[in-house]
């Protein structure tokens, strides 16, 4: 990242994000500099407002993205494809982007192949990073996920063993008397 292109505050945030330990969430990496609101954008609209950045982790460092021969706008967004060799089927890869117009936002990624993801940029050159979340994680709320799989049966088994043991003990005591 060519830090000389950005304000001191943005330089400090970029350094903080790039110096975050592996596995740190986007929310924790921002720390005190976390924006009040981060929105998720698709090709042309806000998909979700005020998403939860604690569901995301970094897949790449923060880097410059420069548009030379084209100027992205909200009416004419530019599709950019990225290579992400560590992408798996269990994760959703999106882009953390510092929009010159809106500030920090997340651009929805579209999986192109096993190691490529694309996103639409609606503003000019700035900084961005590939981020990911587990596919089961919700980005907009703290809703409880529906239960998947079988319920745990150990409480029933423990209860059954207790009652069978109690029955055997009662039967033994009644025969002795």
Q: Can you say where each PLM-predicted feature lies in the sequence?
A:
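Surface-exposed loop/edge segments in extracytoplasmic proteins
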Residues: 101-109
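Solvent-exposed strand-loop boundary residues in beta-sheet-rich modules
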Residues: 99-102, 134-136
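Exposed aromatic-hydrophobic patches
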Residues: 79-83, 116-123
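Feature for mature exported/ectodomain regions
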Residues: 1-58, 70-92, 132-154, 174
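C-terminal membrane-anchoring or membrane-association module
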Residues: 160-177
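C-terminal beta-strand-rich structural cap/linker in extracellular carbohydrate-active enzymes
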Residues: 118-140
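Beta-strand-rich interaction surfaces with strong enrichment in secreted/lumenal proteins
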Residues: 63-71
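Beta-strand signatures of extracellular beta-sandwich domains
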Residues: 94-96
């Amino acid at each position: 990242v060519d830090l000389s292109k950005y304000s001191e505050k943005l330089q400090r945030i970029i350094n903080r994000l790039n110096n975050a330990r592996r596995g740190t969430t986007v929310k924790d990496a921002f720390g005190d500099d976390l924006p009040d609101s981060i929105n998720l954008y698709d090709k042309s609209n806000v998909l979700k407002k005020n998403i939860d950045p604690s569901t995301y982790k970094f897949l790449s460092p923060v880097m410059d993205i420069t548009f030379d021969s084209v100027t992205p706008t909200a009416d004419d967004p530019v599709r950019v494809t990225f290579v992400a060799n560590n992408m798996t089927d269990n994760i959703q890869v999106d882009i953390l982007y510092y929009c010159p117009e809106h500030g920090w936002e997340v651009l929805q990624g579209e999986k192109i192949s096993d190691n490529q993801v694309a996103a639409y940029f609606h503003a000019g050159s700035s900084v961005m990073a590939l981020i990911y979340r587990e596919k089961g994680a919700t980005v907009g709320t703290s809703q409880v996920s529906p239960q998947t799989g079988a319920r745990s049966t150990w409480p029933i088994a423990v209860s059954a063993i207790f009652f069978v043991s109690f029955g055997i003990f009662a039967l033994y005591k009644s025969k002795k008397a």
